[in-house]
């Protein structure tokens, strides 16, 4: 049985687990003796997937086949329809189980391509040098930011994609074995996990030319599905933002010391010094740690830090920045509330609780025992009470200090919240409500994925350090590289800037980070973590020259 269109041909074996061959429109073979696998995971045994390893070819129609997958007990069953379509080979799977389902996955092995390109973690490429018996997993949309991946050859290849506008969590796995790559697509049930049936749909298609061909196809669908507008038109209300090509990031208070990284007076000195090196009107001044005792302390309180000089000095800083021609962006968190905040008892009921009934929040290992201590809670951003509070907090900051832009940290998060409004819908609605309430304030986010692309026109690139062994600290894997797929896909709709944790040029990892930003076309940032760190270095001059060339 052969299923095909102009771009791809898929030859099925009588043994329904096997796909004899997948070849492209030009005859290039990209899979030989590929094995299909289907698995089901249930909440109470999430680490023990049920393997549906028995199949029967139940029905053959014109350009369509139906396969039943079952486990040993025959209690778990997946009905899969595979059919030819204009946009590839469509897979539609319906899974039933004797108890509620958490996650279903489909896998295909023995894929013969040179590399996989994934719009994840800022954009990644995995080459065929990836070690055998290794698998990397990417959750959509937090890590896997757009619902496709590309198996690339010298000219053409195949790609897997889905076209789901709903805010549903998905999973991509890329594995490498002696017989080639393995590709897995997973789909997660929406919380609360009560249903014993779960359905998913995805496509595999071929393409000719380079990797931009499938990206352009997905972008066209994405633009229509999410009603996207190009970034230049979206920035018409903030004309100053169109001129920005550099971020000057000056850190203030720190949690572990009464001595700040910069006082507000020292920040003013930085502004005067920077003016001699780059045009203020092209510089966005970004201020992490301007509030309280440092970044994320007492959130969502954002009173200017007394350690840095207090409210009066902060007003002087912002006024000086404006007088010199700069624009100012403050740092906030889009959903965080510390557990010791006076309002937390009221908001505790709105804390994110995932599908496994675990309360969610940010945590850090403070004592080296590999167990993270709780720091602050994640509040579902779709809750009206949270939106009302954040509008009040941000409104007071904007009115008191004439702030130009607000950075919303952690906008890329995605949870399967069992209690309250859908998390992704809520995040998007929350950002849109903030923008509507403060139409003259630019809102920026951390990272980018399909569900927050429309409301955010500025975003920090996120995750590029993951291509190195331990967050960029121990050297880079040659088989895992940064790739411009994400900036190429999203760059028409959002302006990407460097991440807030970019290192100072004196740090060993800076060279890797800046080279990655240059490859991806990301606006550079000079991040100053101490008032003694120099500005006038050769590396900074190179960053400025790169900034001038960015359109």
Predicted regions and their residues:
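Hydrophobic faces of well-ordered beta-strands that scaffold small-molecule active sites
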Residues: 246-248, 283-287, 328-331, 406-408, ...
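Active-site groove signature of glycoside hydrolases
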Residues: 283-291, 389-419
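Active-site-proximal substrate-binding groove within the catalytic cores of carbohydrate-active enzymes
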Residues: 195, 199-201, 423-551
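Carbohydrate-recognition beta-sandwich/jelly-roll modules
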Residues: 2-284, 308, 320, 327
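Active-site-adjacent "subsite" loops/lids of carbohydrate-active enzymes
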Residues: 313-314, 319, 330, 334-401, ...
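Conserved N-terminal glycine/acidic-rich loop preference
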Residues: 248, 297, 303, 398, ...
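Flexible loop/turn segments at secondary-structure boundaries
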Residues: 211, 257, 292-297, 335-340, ...
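Aromatic- and glycine-enriched glycan-recognition loops and surfaces
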Residues: 250-356, 388-389, 427
């Amino acid at each position: 049985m052969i299923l095909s269109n102009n771009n791809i041909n898929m030859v099925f074996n009588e043994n329904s687990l096997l796909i004899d061959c997948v070849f492209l429109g030009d005859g290039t073979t990209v899979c030989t003796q590929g094995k299909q696998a289907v698995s089901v995971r249930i909440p109470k045994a999430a680490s023990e997937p049920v393997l549906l390893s028995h199949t029967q070819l139940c029905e053959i129609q014109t350009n369509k086949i139906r396969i039943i997958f079952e486990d040993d007990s025959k209690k778990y069953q997946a009905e899969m329809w595979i059919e030819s379509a204009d946009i590839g080979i469509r897979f539609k799977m319906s899974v039933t189980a004797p108890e509620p389902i958490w996650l279903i996955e489909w896998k295909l092995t023995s894929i013969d391509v040179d590399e996989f390109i994934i719009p994840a973690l800022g954009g990644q490429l995995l080459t065929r040098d990836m070690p055998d018996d290794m698998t990397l997993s990417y959750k959509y949309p937090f890590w896997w930011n757009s619902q496709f991946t590309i198996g690339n050859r010298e000219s053409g290849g195949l790609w897997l994609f889905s076209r789901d506008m709903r805010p549903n969590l998905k999973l991509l796995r890329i594995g490498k074995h002696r017989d080639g790559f393995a590709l897995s697509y997973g789909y997660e049930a929406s919380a609360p996990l009560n249903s014993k049936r779960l359905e998913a749909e995805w496509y595999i298609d071929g393409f000719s030319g380079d990797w931009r061909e499938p990206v352009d196809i997905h972008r066209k669908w994405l633009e229509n599905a999410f009603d996207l507008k190009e970034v230049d038109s979206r920035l018409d209300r903030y004309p100053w933002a169109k001129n920005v090509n550099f971020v000057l990031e000056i850190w203030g208070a720190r949690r572990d010391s009464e001595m700040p990284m910069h006082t507000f007076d020292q920040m003013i000195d930085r502004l005067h010094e920077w003016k001699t090196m780059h045009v203020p009107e092209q510089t966005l001044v970004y201020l992490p740690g301007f509030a309280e005792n440092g970044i994320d302390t007492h959130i969502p309180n954002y009173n200017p830090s007394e350690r840095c000089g207090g409210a009066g000095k902060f007003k002087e800083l912002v006024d000086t920045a404006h007088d010199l021609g700069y624009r100012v962006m403050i740092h906030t968190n889009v959903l965080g509330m510390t557990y010791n905040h006076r309002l937390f008892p009221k908001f505790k009921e709105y804390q994110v609780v995932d599908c496994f009934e675990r309360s969610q929040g940010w945590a850090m290992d403070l004592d080296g025992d590999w167990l993270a201590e709780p720091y602050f809670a994640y509040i579902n951003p779709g809750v009206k009470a949270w939106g009302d509070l954040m509008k009040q907090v941000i409104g007071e900051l904007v009115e008191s200090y004439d702030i130009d832009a607000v950075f919303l940290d952690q906008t890329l998060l995605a949870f399967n919240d069992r209690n309250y409004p859908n998390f992704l819908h809520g995040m998007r609605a929350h950002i849109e409500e903030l923008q509507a309430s403060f139409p003259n304030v630019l809102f920026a986010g951390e990272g980018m994925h399909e569900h927050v692309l429309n409301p955010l026109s500025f975003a920090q690139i996120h995750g590029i350090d993951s291509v190195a062994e331990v967050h960029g600290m121990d050297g880079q894997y040659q088989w895992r590289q940064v790739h411009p797929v994400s900036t190429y896909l999203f760059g028409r709709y959002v302006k990407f800037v460097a991440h807030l944790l970019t290192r100072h040029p004196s740090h060993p990892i800076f060279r890797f980070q800046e080279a990655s930003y240059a490859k991806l076309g990301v606006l550079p940032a000079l991040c100053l973590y101490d008032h003694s760190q120099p500005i006038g270095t050769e590396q900074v001059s190179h960053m400025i020259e790169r900034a001038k060339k960015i359109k």
